Curated annotation (Swiss-Prot):
This is Probable dual-specificity RNA methyltransferase RlmN. S-adenosyl-L-methionine binds at residues 182-183, 214, 237-239, 313. Keywords: 4Fe-4S, Cytoplasm, Disulfide bond, Iron, Iron-sulfur, Metal-binding, Methyltransferase, rRNA processing, S-adenosyl-L-methionine, Transferase, tRNA processing. The lineage of its organism: Bacteria, Pseudomonadati, Bacteroidota, Cytophagia, Cytophagales. It comes from Cytophaga hutchinsonii (strain ATCC 33406 / DSM 1761 / CIP 103989 / NBRC 15051 / NCIMB 9469 / D465). Its EC number is 2.1.1.192. Specifically methylates position 2 of adenine 2503 in 23S rRNA and position 2 of adenine 37 in tRNAs. The gene is rlmN. Its main location: cytoplasm.
Amino acid sequence: MILLNLMLYFCSMQTTSTEIKKKCIRSLSAEELKDFFVASGEKAFRSRQVYEWLWKRSARSFEQMTNLSKETRTLLENNFSINPVTISQKQVSTDGTIKFGFKLHDGYLVEGVLIPADDRMTACISSQVGCSLTCKFCATGYMDRKRNLEPYEIYDQVVLIKEAAEEHYQTPLTNIVLMGMGEPLLNYTNVLKGIDKVTSEEGLHIASKRITLSTAGIAKMITKLGDEKVKFRLALSLHAANDVKRNTIMPINETNNLNVLKESLLHFCKETGSSVTFEYIVFDGVNDTAQDAKELYAFAKNIPCKINIIEYNPIQEADFMNTSVDKLEQFKKVLTDKGIIVNIRRSRGKDIDAACGQLAIKEVK
């Protein structure tokens, strides 16, 4: 009876109507895929073959699954879609950075970036189509959020950027940062599932410590990351250690103020044993004074951390200005003199709008 019900369930996916979409096969667990094959009268081991094609071998069509019979491939084609992410646009910066426009199965576009460096090859990927937050310095913040990305769409971005790294630089991908379009912690479940596939042996088997999730600061979700003892790195997009200033730059601070954020970060560090990275864009006349640096030290001093000071990358929608090199160095010195680890991060891909804060694809659908 169970097998009959399963068969009826999966057969119900078949339709001649163009109005009903096929279920994406990559939304099934390994066990659900096995159940489908058994209910269809196929050998259970076929599910393992297909699962390997879908994840480890990143098949983009059922026709690529050459160790399956034509009948089995037709069965899959009639019941499922794969919904692969494809590259619709590509731009190469003078510094070697490559920006991608990724097209999703429903026509929406998101952006990702390959950032080459002497000691690493980094993929910057998106977690949402658009963003519901309204950070004033970020181009994505001026777009509406259309939808969350599915786990397989997060995974596919990594696969495509990994292939580009090998093609253009003959170098493997070493790092992944979720710093593209969207707020990852507002797509919590799908992002963690996507990371799980990227790190698993059945997927790309990339070490968790090579992955960094960047958030604007959703305190309760940072606490949840700590509770789940995640293995990947966490970065907080901070940009001011003063609630009044941060409210202006990042309105999310009005509901996730600095005290609440500090509490959640301390919990995260305690539960995971990891440090965090604070990202701090220095804007001329806004947050670049010695007093701002002292406030940043006061916020960070009891949290295991390092601080990345970032050059501002101009966008059309905002009138912020980059601070001077002298002010940048003075700001850094205030922190390093107090024992804080500080890096100044130079912009990459600015000439193709691929730098931090510049991702906002011109054509959304």
